[in-house]
Protein backbone atom coordinates (compact mmCIF):
# COMPACT_ATOMS: atom_id res chain seq x y z
CA UNK A 1 0.00 0.00 0.00
CA UNK A 2 1.56 3.30 -1.12
CA UNK A 3 1.50 6.41 1.05
CA UNK A 4 -1.62 8.52 0.47
CA UNK A 5 -1.03 11.94 -1.09
CA UNK A 6 -3.63 14.02 0.77
CA UNK A 7 -4.84 17.48 -0.12
CA UNK A 8 -7.81 19.40 1.29
CA UNK A 9 -8.86 19.86 -2.35
CA UNK A 10 -10.34 16.36 -2.03
CA UNK A 11 -13.22 17.84 -0.03
CA UNK A 12 -14.40 20.30 -2.65
CA UNK A 13 -18.04 19.43 -3.31
CA UNK A 14 -18.01 16.42 -0.96
CA UNK A 15 -21.00 15.94 1.34
CA UNK A 16 -19.68 15.64 4.89
CA UNK A 17 -21.71 15.12 8.05
CA UNK A 18 -19.99 16.09 11.30
CA UNK A 19 -21.47 15.22 14.69
CA UNK A 20 -20.40 17.49 17.52
CA UNK A 21 -19.82 20.31 15.04
CA UNK A 22 -20.63 23.06 17.55
CA UNK A 23 -17.87 22.06 19.96
CA UNK A 24 -14.22 23.10 20.11
CA UNK A 25 -12.77 20.65 17.59
CA UNK A 26 -16.01 20.56 15.60
CA UNK A 27 -15.95 24.31 15.00
CA UNK A 28 -12.35 24.26 13.80
CA UNK A 29 -13.17 21.30 11.54
CA UNK A 30 -16.16 23.08 10.02
CA UNK A 31 -14.08 26.19 9.37
CA UNK A 32 -11.48 23.99 7.65
CA UNK A 33 -14.05 22.10 5.56
CA UNK A 34 -15.86 25.27 4.52
CA UNK A 35 -12.56 26.69 3.32
CA UNK A 36 -12.04 23.56 1.23
CA UNK A 37 -15.45 23.87 -0.43
CA UNK A 38 -17.19 20.94 1.25
CA UNK A 39 -20.96 20.71 1.69
CA UNK A 40 -21.16 20.34 5.47
CA UNK A 41 -24.05 19.19 7.62
CA UNK A 42 -23.53 19.40 11.36
CA UNK A 43 -25.48 17.67 14.12
CA UNK A 44 -24.82 18.68 17.71
CA UNK A 45 -26.06 20.27 20.91
CA UNK A 46 -26.50 24.03 21.29
CA UNK A 47 -23.52 26.00 20.00
CA UNK A 48 -20.46 26.78 22.08
CA UNK A 49 -19.12 30.32 22.27
CA UNK A 50 -16.44 29.46 19.72
CA UNK A 51 -19.00 28.26 17.18
CA UNK A 52 -20.83 31.58 17.43
CA UNK A 53 -17.59 33.54 17.09
CA UNK A 54 -16.29 31.49 14.15
CA UNK A 55 -19.04 32.53 11.72
CA UNK A 56 -19.65 29.11 10.20
CA UNK A 57 -23.34 28.58 10.94
CA UNK A 58 -24.53 30.39 7.80
CA UNK A 59 -22.01 28.49 5.67
CA UNK A 60 -23.16 24.97 6.60
CA UNK A 61 -26.39 23.15 7.41
CA UNK A 62 -26.37 23.25 11.21
CA UNK A 63 -28.87 21.00 12.99
CA UNK A 64 -29.28 21.16 16.76
CA UNK A 65 -29.93 17.71 18.17
CA UNK A 66 -28.78 14.98 20.53
CA UNK A 67 -27.03 11.85 19.26
CA UNK A 68 -29.13 9.89 21.75
CA UNK A 69 -32.16 10.70 19.55
CA UNK A 70 -31.94 8.05 16.83
CA UNK A 71 -35.13 9.08 15.01
CA UNK A 72 -34.08 12.71 14.62
CA UNK A 73 -30.53 11.73 13.69
CA UNK A 74 -31.75 9.39 10.94
CA UNK A 75 -33.93 12.16 9.53
CA UNK A 76 -30.85 14.37 9.24
CA UNK A 77 -28.89 11.59 7.51
CA UNK A 78 -31.78 10.97 5.10
CA UNK A 79 -31.90 14.63 4.12
CA UNK A 80 -28.14 15.24 3.93
CA UNK A 81 -27.18 12.00 2.13
CA UNK A 82 -23.57 12.35 3.31
CA UNK A 83 -20.65 10.61 1.65
CA UNK A 84 -18.36 11.01 4.67
CA UNK A 85 -19.26 11.00 8.37
CA UNK A 86 -16.96 12.24 11.15
CA UNK A 87 -18.33 11.36 14.60
CA UNK A 88 -17.07 13.74 17.28
CA UNK A 89 -20.18 14.31 19.43
CA UNK A 90 -19.38 13.30 23.00
CA UNK A 91 -19.39 14.13 26.67
CA UNK A 92 -15.65 14.85 26.67
CA UNK A 93 -14.69 15.81 30.23
CA UNK A 94 -13.24 13.23 32.65
CA UNK A 95 -14.40 15.02 35.80
CA UNK A 96 -17.92 15.50 34.45
CA UNK A 97 -18.09 11.75 33.82
CA UNK A 98 -17.66 11.13 37.55
CA UNK A 99 -20.52 13.54 38.27
CA UNK A 100 -22.86 12.09 35.65
CA UNK A 101 -21.73 8.64 34.47
CA UNK A 102 -25.13 7.62 33.08
CA UNK A 103 -25.28 10.62 30.73
CA UNK A 104 -21.66 10.01 29.75
CA UNK A 105 -22.31 6.38 28.78
CA UNK A 106 -25.60 7.23 27.07
CA UNK A 107 -23.92 9.88 24.93
CA UNK A 108 -20.59 8.23 24.23
CA UNK A 109 -21.75 4.63 23.80
CA UNK A 110 -25.36 4.72 22.63
CA UNK A 111 -24.64 7.91 20.72
CA UNK A 112 -22.03 5.96 18.75
CA UNK A 113 -24.50 3.10 18.24
CA UNK A 114 -27.05 5.55 16.87
CA UNK A 115 -24.60 7.22 14.50
CA UNK A 116 -23.39 3.86 13.18
CA UNK A 117 -26.99 2.70 12.79
CA UNK A 118 -27.63 5.76 10.63
CA UNK A 119 -24.49 5.01 8.63
CA UNK A 120 -25.75 1.44 8.16
CA UNK A 121 -29.11 2.73 6.91
CA UNK A 122 -27.69 5.42 4.60
CA UNK A 123 -26.36 4.02 1.34
CA UNK A 124 -24.55 7.22 0.37
CA UNK A 125 -21.99 6.93 3.20
CA UNK A 126 -18.66 5.55 1.98
CA UNK A 127 -16.34 6.64 4.79
CA UNK A 128 -16.84 6.83 8.58
CA UNK A 129 -14.37 7.95 11.24
CA UNK A 130 -15.14 7.65 14.94
CA UNK A 131 -13.07 10.09 17.00
CA UNK A 132 -12.24 8.66 20.41
CA UNK A 133 -9.31 9.45 22.72
CA UNK A 134 -5.89 8.41 23.96
CA UNK A 135 -7.62 7.41 27.19
CA UNK A 136 -9.25 4.30 25.67
CA UNK A 137 -6.25 2.19 26.70
CA UNK A 138 -5.78 0.34 29.97
CA UNK A 139 -3.33 2.76 31.56
CA UNK A 140 -0.41 0.96 33.14
CA UNK A 141 1.57 4.19 33.74
CA UNK A 142 4.17 2.93 31.26
CA UNK A 143 6.93 5.35 30.17
CA UNK A 144 6.41 4.40 26.51
CA UNK A 145 3.53 5.09 24.15
CA UNK A 146 0.48 2.87 23.77
CA UNK A 147 0.05 1.16 20.41
CA UNK A 148 -3.20 0.46 18.61
CA UNK A 149 -3.15 -3.23 19.60
CA UNK A 150 -2.98 -2.54 23.36
CA UNK A 151 -5.88 -3.49 25.65
CA UNK A 152 -8.86 -1.12 25.63
CA UNK A 153 -10.11 -0.53 29.17
CA UNK A 154 -10.38 3.10 30.27
CA UNK A 155 -10.44 3.67 34.03
CA UNK A 156 -13.01 6.43 34.59
CA UNK A 157 -16.51 6.66 33.06
CA UNK A 158 -15.39 9.00 30.27
CA UNK A 159 -12.36 6.94 29.28
CA UNK A 160 -14.25 3.67 29.62
CA UNK A 161 -17.21 4.94 27.59
CA UNK A 162 -14.78 5.76 24.79
CA UNK A 163 -13.28 2.27 25.06
CA UNK A 164 -16.83 0.96 24.66
CA UNK A 165 -17.32 3.27 21.67
CA UNK A 166 -14.30 1.63 20.06
CA UNK A 167 -15.80 -1.83 20.64
CA UNK A 168 -19.15 -0.73 19.23
CA UNK A 169 -17.39 0.52 16.10
CA UNK A 170 -15.50 -2.75 15.73
CA UNK A 171 -18.69 -4.77 16.10
CA UNK A 172 -20.58 -2.73 13.51
CA UNK A 173 -17.62 -2.93 11.14
CA UNK A 174 -17.47 -6.73 11.45
CA UNK A 175 -21.22 -7.29 11.45
CA UNK A 176 -22.50 -4.90 8.79
CA UNK A 177 -19.59 -3.60 6.72
CA UNK A 178 -17.60 -6.77 6.08
CA UNK A 179 -17.78 -7.06 2.30
CA UNK A 180 -16.31 -10.58 2.41
CA UNK A 181 -19.44 -11.70 4.22
CA UNK A 182 -21.92 -9.72 2.15
CA UNK A 183 -21.79 -6.50 4.14
CA UNK A 184 -22.17 -3.06 2.62
CA UNK A 185 -19.08 -1.33 1.29
CA UNK A 186 -18.23 1.47 3.73
CA UNK A 187 -14.79 2.14 5.22
CA UNK A 188 -14.85 2.29 9.03
CA UNK A 189 -12.03 3.69 11.19
CA UNK A 190 -11.34 5.09 14.64
CA UNK A 191 -8.90 7.85 15.55
CA UNK A 192 -7.50 8.00 19.08
CA UNK A 193 -6.25 11.52 19.66
CA UNK A 194 -4.10 12.95 22.42
CA UNK A 195 -4.88 16.08 24.43
CA UNK A 196 -5.85 18.93 22.12
CA UNK A 197 -5.04 22.59 22.74
CA UNK A 198 -5.93 25.65 20.70
CA UNK A 199 -7.68 28.98 20.60
CA UNK A 200 -11.36 29.01 21.48
CA UNK A 201 -11.52 26.16 23.97
CA UNK A 202 -13.74 27.40 26.81
CA UNK A 203 -14.32 24.05 28.53
CA UNK A 204 -14.07 23.64 32.29
CA UNK A 205 -11.35 21.46 33.81
CA UNK A 206 -8.97 21.83 30.88
CA UNK A 207 -5.61 23.37 31.56
CA UNK A 208 -5.30 25.96 28.76
CA UNK A 209 -8.84 27.34 29.25
CA UNK A 210 -8.07 27.49 32.98
CA UNK A 211 -4.94 29.51 32.18
CA UNK A 212 -6.84 31.93 29.96
CA UNK A 213 -9.61 32.41 32.53
CA UNK A 214 -7.02 33.15 35.20
CA UNK A 215 -5.45 35.82 32.99
CA UNK A 216 -8.85 37.33 32.25
CA UNK A 217 -9.51 37.61 35.98
CA UNK A 218 -6.02 38.86 36.82
CA UNK A 219 -5.43 35.76 38.94
CA UNK A 220 -2.60 33.34 39.43
CA UNK A 221 -3.08 30.10 37.49
CA UNK A 222 -4.05 27.13 39.65
CA UNK A 223 -2.62 23.77 38.57
CA UNK A 224 -4.04 20.77 40.39
CA UNK A 225 -1.56 18.17 39.11
CA UNK A 226 1.59 19.65 37.53
CA UNK A 227 3.31 16.26 37.30
CA UNK A 228 0.83 14.44 35.04
CA UNK A 229 2.19 13.85 31.52
CA UNK A 230 -0.01 14.14 28.44
CA UNK A 231 0.48 14.09 24.64
CA UNK A 232 -0.43 17.72 23.87
CA UNK A 233 -1.07 18.79 20.27
CA UNK A 234 -2.49 21.80 18.44
CA UNK A 235 -6.16 21.44 17.50
CA UNK A 236 -5.52 21.39 13.74
CA UNK A 237 -3.20 18.38 13.99
CA UNK A 238 -5.87 15.76 14.80
CA UNK A 239 -8.48 17.45 12.62
CA UNK A 240 -6.13 17.22 9.65
CA UNK A 241 -5.55 13.54 10.43
CA UNK A 242 -9.27 12.78 10.73
CA UNK A 243 -9.88 14.37 7.35
CA UNK A 244 -6.84 12.69 5.79
CA UNK A 245 -7.98 9.28 7.05
CA UNK A 246 -11.58 9.83 5.92
CA UNK A 247 -10.40 10.85 2.45
CA UNK A 248 -7.88 8.02 2.09
CA UNK A 249 -10.31 5.26 3.00
CA UNK A 250 -13.00 6.85 0.82
CA UNK A 251 -10.71 6.22 -2.15
CA UNK A 252 -9.10 3.00 -0.90
CA UNK A 253 -10.71 0.94 1.87
CA UNK A 254 -7.40 -0.73 2.72
CA UNK A 255 -6.48 2.41 4.67
CA UNK A 256 -9.31 1.83 7.16
CA UNK A 257 -8.28 0.86 10.68
CA UNK A 258 -7.55 2.16 14.16
CA UNK A 259 -5.02 4.98 14.43
CA UNK A 260 -3.35 6.87 17.25
CA UNK A 261 -3.06 10.59 16.55
CA UNK A 262 -0.60 12.41 18.75
CA UNK A 263 2.50 14.58 18.93
CA UNK A 264 6.16 13.67 18.80
CA UNK A 265 7.70 12.54 22.07
CA UNK A 266 9.22 15.97 22.65
CA UNK A 267 5.70 17.39 23.06
CA UNK A 268 4.60 14.81 25.63
CA UNK A 269 5.18 17.08 28.60
CA UNK A 270 3.94 17.48 32.15
CA UNK A 271 1.09 19.85 32.87
CA UNK A 272 3.53 22.02 34.80
CA UNK A 273 5.82 22.27 31.78
CA UNK A 274 2.87 23.18 29.55
CA UNK A 275 1.79 25.94 31.94
CA UNK A 276 5.38 27.19 32.11
CA UNK A 277 5.28 27.48 28.33
CA UNK A 278 1.95 29.31 28.48
CA UNK A 279 3.33 31.78 31.02
CA UNK A 280 6.50 32.37 28.98
CA UNK A 281 4.52 32.89 25.76
CA UNK A 282 1.93 35.11 27.45
CA UNK A 283 4.52 37.31 29.15
CA UNK A 284 6.55 37.65 25.94
CA UNK A 285 3.45 38.61 23.93
CA UNK A 286 2.41 41.29 26.44
CA UNK A 287 5.94 42.38 27.38
CA UNK A 288 5.34 46.00 26.36
CA UNK A 289 1.81 46.18 27.78
CA UNK A 290 2.15 47.62 31.28
CA UNK A 291 -1.54 46.95 32.00
CA UNK A 292 -1.25 43.20 31.37
CA UNK A 293 -0.79 40.97 34.40
CA UNK A 294 2.25 38.73 34.32
CA UNK A 295 1.32 35.06 34.07
CA UNK A 296 2.40 32.74 36.88
CA UNK A 297 1.08 29.57 38.47
CA UNK A 298 0.95 27.59 41.68
CA UNK A 299 0.14 24.00 42.53
CA UNK A 300 -3.06 23.56 44.54
CA UNK A 301 -4.35 19.99 44.76
CA UNK A 302 -8.13 19.71 45.08
CA UNK A 303 -8.02 15.98 45.87
CA UNK A 304 -10.23 15.27 42.88
CA UNK A 305 -11.08 11.85 41.42
CA UNK A 306 -8.52 9.55 39.82
CA UNK A 307 -6.90 10.68 36.59
CA UNK A 308 -4.00 9.02 34.77
CA UNK A 309 -0.53 10.16 35.77
CA UNK A 310 1.44 9.28 32.63
CA UNK A 311 -0.07 8.91 29.17
CA UNK A 312 1.67 8.80 25.80
CA UNK A 313 0.78 7.46 22.35
CA UNK A 314 2.90 5.55 19.86
CA UNK A 315 1.95 7.09 16.52
CA UNK A 316 4.25 4.96 14.36
CA UNK A 317 1.31 3.45 12.46
CA UNK A 318 -0.21 6.66 11.11
CA UNK A 319 3.27 8.02 10.33
CA UNK A 320 4.27 4.90 8.42
CA UNK A 321 0.92 4.54 6.62
CA UNK A 322 0.47 8.13 5.51
CA UNK A 323 3.94 9.63 5.77
CA UNK A 324 2.41 12.08 8.24
CA UNK A 325 4.26 14.03 10.90
CA UNK A 326 2.98 16.78 13.19
CA UNK A 327 3.13 20.19 11.55
CA UNK A 328 3.78 22.23 14.73
CA UNK A 329 5.41 21.64 18.09
CA UNK A 330 3.68 22.92 21.23
CA UNK A 331 5.74 26.12 21.39
CA UNK A 332 4.27 27.13 18.00
CA UNK A 333 0.85 25.91 19.15
CA UNK A 334 1.11 28.14 22.21
CA UNK A 335 1.99 31.18 20.09
CA UNK A 336 -1.20 30.58 18.10
CA UNK A 337 -3.26 30.17 21.27
CA UNK A 338 -2.00 33.50 22.61
CA UNK A 339 -2.65 35.17 19.24
CA UNK A 340 -6.22 33.82 19.17
CA UNK A 341 -6.84 34.78 22.79
CA UNK A 342 -5.54 38.33 22.28
CA UNK A 343 -7.89 38.75 19.33
CA UNK A 344 -10.79 37.44 21.42
CA UNK A 345 -10.06 39.68 24.41
CA UNK A 346 -9.84 42.73 22.16
CA UNK A 347 -13.05 41.91 20.26
CA UNK A 348 -11.17 41.30 17.03
CA UNK A 349 -11.95 39.31 13.88
CA UNK A 350 -11.99 35.69 15.08
CA UNK A 351 -12.83 34.10 11.69
CA UNK A 352 -9.86 35.92 10.15
CA UNK A 353 -7.49 34.65 12.85
CA UNK A 354 -8.79 31.10 12.44
CA UNK A 355 -8.41 31.22 8.66
CA UNK A 356 -4.91 32.67 9.02
CA UNK A 357 -3.85 29.85 11.33
CA UNK A 358 -5.44 27.21 9.09
CA UNK A 359 -3.65 28.63 6.04
CA UNK A 360 -0.30 28.69 7.87
CA UNK A 361 -0.86 25.15 9.11
CA UNK A 362 -1.67 23.74 5.68
Language model segments and positions:
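Generic recognition of short, well-ordered alpha-helical segments
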Residues: 28, 75, 96-99, 110, ...
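Residues in well-ordered alpha-helical elements
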Residues: 70-71, 83, 95, 102, ...
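Short, charged helix-to-loop "capping" segments that act as catalytic/coupling loops
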Residues: 48, 79-82, 120-126, 197-204, ...
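Asparagine-centered polar/low-complexity signal
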Residues: 107-108, 114, 195, 225, ...
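Short, solvent-exposed loop/helix junctions and linker helices
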Residues: 19, 67, 106-109, 158, ...
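N-terminal Rossmann-like NAD(P)+-binding domain of SDR-like oxidoreductases, especially those catalyzing
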Residues: 1-193, 344, 361
